[in-house]
Amino acid sequence: MTSPWGHSADLARFYTVTEPQRHPRGYTVYKVTARVVSRRNPEDVQEIIVWRRYSDFKKLHRELWQIHRNAFRHSELFPPFAKGTVFGRFDKTVIEERRQCAEDLLQFSANIPALYNSRQLQDFFKGGVISDGSELIGPAEAYPDSPANAFPECGTEGFSSDSDLLSLTVDADSLAEVDDGMASRQGSPSRTFGLSLSTDSSAVGAVASDSEPSRVEDRESRSLFPSSLKPRLGRRDYLEKAGELIKLALKKEEEDDYEAASDFYRKGVDLLLEGVQGESSPTRREAVKRRTAEYLMRAESICSLRAAPQLHTGPQPPGSLSSRPPWSLRSPAEELKAFRVLGVIDKVLLVMDTRTEQTFILKGLRKSSECSRNRKTIIPRCVPNMVCLHTYIISEESVFLVLQRAEGGKLWSYISKFLNRSSQESLDIKEGRPSMPPRVCLQQPSASPQGGSSFESRGSDTGSMLKALPLKTSLTPSSQDDSNQEDDGQPSSPKWLDSGSSSEDECTAGYLTLCNEYGQEKMDLVSLSEESVMQPEGDKADTQAVSSPASLATGSVSPSTHLRVFSGGEDLEAVSSPPTSESLSRSKNSPMEFFRIDSKDSTSELLGLDFGEKLHSLKPEPLKALFTLEDGDSPSQSLDPGESKRESEAQDSVSRGSDDSVPVISFKEAAAEAISGAEEGRPDLLVNLPGELQPTKEASAMDPKFSQASAGRLDSKLLEAPDVLCLRLSSEQCHGLGPEGPEELSDPTEFCPGGVIPEHDAQADPGVLFEAAVDHRSSPDQFLFSSLRSESDRLGQVEVVVTAQALQESLFHISSPCSGANKEHSAYADTATSEEVLLFTEPTKEEANSLFQRGSEAQERGVGAGEADKEIHQIFEDLDKRLAASSRFFIPEGCIQRWAAEMVVALDALHREGIVCRDLNPNNILLNDGGHIQLTYFSRWSEVEDSCDSDAVARMYCAPEVGAVTEETEACDWWSLGAVLFELLTGKTLVECHPAGINTHTTLNMPGCVSEEARSLIQQLLQFNPMERLGAGVAGVEDIKSHPFFTPVDWAELTR
């Protein structure tokens, strides 16, 4: 277009009405923008901006309506206009209606030459500010924000400020996009229309052609603007190419690929410097120079950021610099091929790096569909008492974190015994079973040669040994969110104790298929009630089956410790086991927890918080022959079949009373089943099979032989849930018990391979759990756990009925017959003195003698069922008393003080990084191999949506302001710390003591054993108002560190 006149097909007109504002004189004005684009050369753009009020629009509507009616005689097609109102004219709805009507009117006139060429329309835009198209990609000058101001030379918005460009949280759109010179009919008043640097000119032409009127006018028409649209034949497309490179640089920067981002910045700068040489417009030339300088500064800052990790070899203190992800931690997605999956731990994977053979935890964070550009990515690297990040891998859909594995497991797995919680202990018994009475004891952990992992030792001891895998306990069975947050270093247990949900929903199809096949086969209940006593085929009169008793309510066993069953000095032979299908057919439905590594965290409903209530509610059947002992050595005594049926019913009420009390399927049998069914396409089990030591040939020479049927009955017994209340009775109870048996209890050292068993080995205490995972060469560790043993010595022993059935149906259910009459009474001595950890202990020799003596006297007097019931009632009363006494035992405050200080140091470091945990709960608190606190890994990613654990909120581990309208500050984590410490000090959760919640006037309920310093700390941390919470003041975390509760703590040592 070289003249102001041209055909209507050569120009496209677009109008927008935006930014309604109040004029200083009291009325509302609207910003009207008109743009004319050449269809032949879309780069030729002219723009005019005016500010008009409602009365101006109404006048223009009346004039254009008159012209349209005279020209076309179809006034009904003309768009209507909003009617004027006196009241409510400043309402948002009224203003928006007027703005939309004005925009529709102008856009309607853009398609009719008689209207857009009219004098009335040109008078409407008279006095506006005209901008040539060359300035649309020019300096970042803002439009006038008020009609009362003088109209300066208008440009388009580019960067909002220099600080936006240099900020780590820079918005890519603000860097790469400018005014696009186009407007749509349905544009929002607050929408900014811009022409991107990478906008294709063909796209602009397409938009213009779409708005071309269907009826082309042949007559000439005047241009809307007084000046012509001058062609810019010398302009090149270097701005578009440079814009594409800058966008790629921003994208790589968001992905933390700083090397590629720096290269794209440099290429874009080179292109801008070449193109600006021939630029005729001085305004655009200045704009390009300013942009070039900004891109160069950005490229230099990226180079310095990449070089920063190499300059500082030592660990950096927490802060903004350490939060920036170093280039060395970033790994390409192909790195995932180097990791081999060893197992599934709840929502994370236990993997091994095949290059270094080290084990790690692999956690995946799925990217959200809408990433928040305002949220900065923070990757902490130097946070004490938190698991370390080895590397991270970013793919198209997820962010994978390769994390350090916390060797000690979860803290709550160790302290659950002190908090009156006992988790279900299920042992995987092997097919090979020794013939001597086994002994259960704890063994210290062995050092692992591999960095970052410690597997259970598989070394051999003197004599044959049967190793059983203890299932680690926890307050929470595995199933959960996230987790928030879920967890990084160890199995995360999202669901809480009273949650009835199973983790089957989270398992893969392979696991579900395997379990469904096992679950289709039911246990034959009739065969269990009619079983006879398992005896060797040799000398039957001189042997009997016994079982090592364990405590009636044990807690979790340390993952770094394991149980060993020691046998005597005689040679042994493995018992022949029934076919795998036969043993599996006797099993019930097993939940997925028994096929996953994190099954160690499953809990037992029978031994849960309401254990004392269940003891009262269970009503045993009348058992007449409970203490009836046979005179002589013949073990032929048996019970009446009717009573055996009732006993089976009583047994069933315990072993099948809850969904959690289910049998354990042997991992070895499951593996054999999977191998035999490989042709059917059954998936392999992703678990680590517990270790087993096969008996040597020499040890198997003198072992008595067992029949196949006897071994099958033993296997079915082992597959059942443990009869912890000793309610399961059969003919085996009274078999082989002479009246002289209790008096001849011998020293348990007879069965130890070394000949001597120390007293502390025979009777474990709660301190063993902590000492097993502590390096005794470190004095702080000894201080941390030494007080637990002395506290546990105050617990008394519980009188338990020592019958053959009580021994055989113990919690761990490890059974084997004696081999020889000379070993018969020694078996009782061994099993009576050996014990597992916590709440209940085995009876002493004198207690066992008195109990059996009462049974013998009852038989001689012909005591009936009423006297037998009385004996059981007394036993349960004594159990209740002992349980109440043990419930008064708490964790020493010295241990809690150390753990709390380590958590304070970790939270303070995270806060300095800019991370607020919000939902810190017991699932996030782990232990390292030295027994010190390690939190799960907390980070923040711009592409991953932050989430809060709903169960943690319901359990009051989260502050009241979490999820509310108030701001979530660092004080949220201090509330979580108070909730955790409350549970450690009192033995009960906060929601149990305060089910109605905590408000501004709530007084916390804490037992008298809690010190005044601890009470004060908890009371100040659990303040409803976050501003009044300890640690939320001006001094911050220093207020917490200076609290009297932490007086003995050396903070300088903890922060090293």
Curated annotation (Swiss-Prot):
ATP binds at residues 795-803, 823. It is found in: Cytoplasm; Membrane; Early endosome. Interacts with SPHK1 and phosphatidylinositol 3-phosphate. Interacts (via PX domain) with PRDX3. This is Ribosomal protein S6 kinase delta-1. The gene is Rps6kc1. Residues 8-132 form the PX domain. The active site is at residue 919. It catalyses: L-seryl-[protein] + ATP = O-phospho-L-seryl-[protein] + ADP + H(+); L-threonyl-[protein] + ATP = O-phospho-L-threonyl-[protein] + ADP + H(+).
